[in-house]
Amino acid sequence: MIRLNPNLKNLKKNYLFVDIQKKTDKFISENPDAEIIKMGIGDVTLPLCETVVQAMKKAAEEMGNKETFRGYGPYEGYEFLKEAISEKYKSFGAKIEPNEVYVSDGSKNDVANILDIFAKGSEVLITDPVYPVYLDSNVMAGNSVKYAEATKDNNFLPMPSEKSDIIYLCSPNNPTGAVYTKEQLKKWIDFATENGSLIIFDAAYEAFIEDENLPHSIFEIEGAEKCAVELSSFSKAAGFTGVRCAYMIIPNELEISGEKLGDVWLRRQSIKFNGVSYVTQAAAFASLSEKGKEETAKAVKYYKENAKIIAKVMAELGLYNIGSENSPYIWVKAPNSMTSWEFFDYLLKEANIVCTPGSGFGPSGEGFVRISSFNSRENTLIAAERLKKLKF
């Protein structure tokens, strides 16, 4: 008789953002006149930039022409996009060859899908709090998960301690906004090298880094090419949450069990993935053009300004917060010993603002909430005025 994957029973009943939506919907049904401002889920709100839109139109027209029509594309992505991504890394001082780039339809997928190529029952270390998909995907795979606690005491940047097979690092971190320095990443790289571990480095928010001394990629640090892969995405940097395009960097030097990891990943992709559409990749390529970079940078700046507006108000209220300098998120300590969900309920009831409870990102997130800057300036300013009126 067919059976379900028994590991599914070890998952929480709902994904974090499903619970948030249910609570929000219930509040709206009971308070139909409330003007809710959603600052929870990290979804962009600005439209795609003009250069990207024109590239998509042109690519779509090419698909309707017999001479320029394209069918299935390469599993790992078209060469034109891989070369553009390679050039992007050069601007960071990281040497990445086009054949080390593997284009996909989203980093969320890559986070989970890469587990297909590793042995079941692997020991996995994730920082806590962090993006829930790291935990859930490993629970589904039957892996053993350990936490490296990110707290105020360590500036939300835990350093190596326990040996593990796979290490997930996210910098800038989601949800805290904390960013590792080159020196700190070097310690993680040395730790992984000494223990035969693989680092899965999530750089989804690197476009929001302002500090010129902070690394945008783990491959800016010597030794990473032998112990790390990197995930990155066009979702937040270019507003592609509804378009879906990302990529993984797997260095040619990286081997596991005597096999080149890039070759193993490509074999996996050839079985379970048919590549990203030509129209989507043409759009991603356009976002990396000089004009595209100029336009997408304006959107990133817009969100960063939103973050600073909210962070300033939180500071004026006397609430500890971090993240707004190099991240689109503001990580806020709840007042009066409130739990994460209690502060969520308070903000929803008293200010009609939806945030994300920090406990949903892991045990160490208890007592915090995450506020997203992905919103209109108008809504951000209205939210700021509502927050100013709160009394704790």
Role assignments for model-derived ranges:
Residues 126, 147, 201, 355-357:
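Hydrophobic residues in well-ordered beta-strands that form the structural core
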Residues 221-301, 308-312:
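Conserved core segment of the aminotransferase class I/II
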Residues 87, 95, 337, 346-355, ...:
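PLP-dependent enzyme catalytic core of the Aspartate aminotransferase-like
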Residues 67-192, 206-211, 215-221, 225:
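Conserved core of the PLP fold type I
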Residues 2-106, 113, 287-290:
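N-terminal small-domain helix-loop-helix segment of the aminotransferase-like
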Residues 31, 141, 194-195, 317, ...:
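Helix C-cap/helix->beta junction micro-motif
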Residues 281, 285, 300-314, 321-333, ...:
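Conserved glycine-rich beta-strand-loop-beta hairpin in the small C-terminal domain of fold type I
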